[in-house]
Amino acid sequence: MLSEKTIEIVKSTVPLLQEKGVEITTRFYEILFSEHPELLNIFNHTNQKKGRQQQALANAVYAAATYIDNLEVIIPVVKQIGHKHRSLGIKAEHYPIVGTCLLRAIKEVAGAPDEVLNAWGEAYGVIADAFISIEAEMYEEAAHKEGGWKDFRNFVVVKKVKESDVITSFYLKPEDGGKVSSFIPGQYVTVQINIEGETYTHNRQYSLSDAPGKEYYRISVKKEKGVDTPDGKVSNYLHDHVKEGDMLPVSAPAGDFVLNMDSTLPVVLISGGVGITPMMSMLNTLIEQDSKRNVCFVHAALNSNTHAMKEHVEALDNEYEQVKAYTCYSAPTEKDLEMKNFDKEGLIEAEWLQTIIPTTEAEFYFCGPVAFMKHINATLTDLGVKQEHIHYEFFGPAASLQ
């Protein structure tokens, strides 16, 4: 239990964190990786280089300081981060290392006096305990469910399928021949990649793109081509070098962006690009469980060349009365224009969306590039969709949609 004095001191640093939060977290990671380079085997190097991880941590530290007197408010965020930590294999023994480096960064960047550092040290201990407790439960649950396991388990690529010019699916079965644990549609796994010539292991999270209950997991990976940045190292390696018969270490499914199976409301699934992957899991699950809920499936892509799983979704639309699928192309090819194989050219806009969704009293799920998600979030808000019915997933560190 933190004293009133400690709470007061921590809350007094909120303006400082608002101003210098990213500077502090940037310095924190510099200290962390220089003194503990082995942790580079856990963290996503690309997110570090792009500053996304630093921003995400700054947001989390700011929220912790703001609500240090009522941490229940940020428990949903703690759980969301906890899922990511569990999937990466972050353990209780890592937290003291992080705490020491964070306090050093606060001192170096902000010149914080000992009184502030001591208060933050106490506060960090309480916050770390919350993470450790929640993550311990997650590890326990993942390991003890049927077909479950702890940390990483070797999976064999039994099938590799090209879904579009940029997206390829990998079907994964356990090397040990055992069962795979079930998951909730929308969840992801971490895949561990060791690239020849690279010093450190690369970990990447990929949404499971098929319904649970199979003998395999399916991930569908976009080959990331850099614009003013290098190409995606891991996605290109998977596309170009990983073949059927190869082995990949995989963590048990995790994540809190999940389909609400208890709701009876209609479902609207909106995706941009590779954001289609968790939506495919949700759509396939609703079909396989014989759900009678109306499903509106809206996908945005450049054109048919980059549009993954188009034929599968169209087949479900044709076969099931409750499924309606719509496609939006921002750069249709001449063939697309000739064949008229899409519903709208340009972006997903409120006026068009309003004509195809069954009702605003529905559960809305969306995923895609950050700019796309900000646009969809604003559009749904403008249409009057209740916040509790809006669900979304970031590929990478969480960011603000405001």
Swiss-Prot record:
The UniProt record lists the FAD-binding FR-type domain at 150-260
Class of the enzyme per the UniProt entry, highest EC level: oxidoreductase
Domain of life of the organism in this record? Bacteria
Q: Where does FAD bind?
A: Y188, R204, Q205, Y206, S207, F394, F395, G396, P397
Give GO terms: molecular function aspect only: FAD binding; heme binding; metal ion binding; nitric oxide dioxygenase NAD(P)H activity; oxygen binding; oxygen carrier activity
Tell me its cofactors: heme b; FAD
Q: Where does NADP(+) bind?
A: G273, V274, G275, I276, T277, P278
Q: How is the cofactor bound?
A: Binds 1 heme b (iron(II)-protoporphyrin IX) group per subunit.
Q: Which residues form the Globin domain?
A: 1-136
| UniProt-annotated stretches for the region Reductase | 147-402
The UniProt site entry described as Involved in heme-bound ligand stabilization and O-O bond activation is assigned to Y29
Sites where the protein binds heme b: H85
The EC number on file is 1.14.12.17
Q: Where is this site: Influences the redox potential of the prosthetic heme and FAD groups?
A: K84, E393
Q: Which UniProt keywords apply?
A: Detoxification, FAD, Flavoprotein, Heme, Iron, Metal-binding, NAD, NADP, Oxidoreductase, Oxygen transport, Transport
A Pfam family that this protein carries is FAD_binding_6
| NCBIfam families per record | PRK13289.1
Q: Which family does it belong to?
A: Belongs to the globin family. Two-domain flavohemoproteins subfamily.
| Protein name, entry field | Flavohemoprotein
Taxonomic lineage from the root: Bacteria, Bacillati, Bacillota, Bacilli, Bacillales
